Amino acid sequence: MASLVPTRPIVIDTREQTPWTFPDGIKTVRRGIHFGDYTLDGLDEIVAIERKSAMDMIGCVGQSRSRFEKHLYGLADLPFAHVIIECSMRALCETCSKTGVNVSSLVGTIIAWQAATGVHFWTPDDRRFATALAVRILFHSEKKWDQKLAQVGVGQNTPLHLVGEPTRLLSEAVDEYRGGSTLPPR
């Protein structure tokens, strides 16, 4: 069975204060990323994962909401965009209750954000599971993107800014992948 890890190095944003530790054999690099905390080398404009702790996520619904929403709509421009909250939904709701934030508001906001932007929100049980989930997300995003490149006759190592005419075809493929939906105005 083939290994389910990406072939490109995983890029960890330099602002990430408590980065995930990936298993041996997975190459990583640290550098600044425009959107998200994790991506793949060369695919910054294709895939991103934003990592949040329970308290971070609760803050995003409250006092940091406008900043997070701006960031979320930037993520939504990518074909593969994800937010991984490092706890189960139950643990997130329990933490929310302890802070005085309305649980229904938190859950409703996350659902509304996902529906409005198409960004996937994940709630794995813990940090270890979150790390494993991130590896799988990056692997499958890379695989799907490489298939799209192959469909338009572009090699996976061709820098996107040098692609030329196939860029239009890739854009159409991304729109098709998203179901042709357009995002609401910002």
Predicted feature locations:
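Conserved catalytic cores of phosphodiester-cleaving nucleases, focusing on short active-site segments
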Residues: 47-53
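Non-catalytic C-terminal interaction segments of nucleic acid-processing enzymes
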Residues: 1-45, 56-186
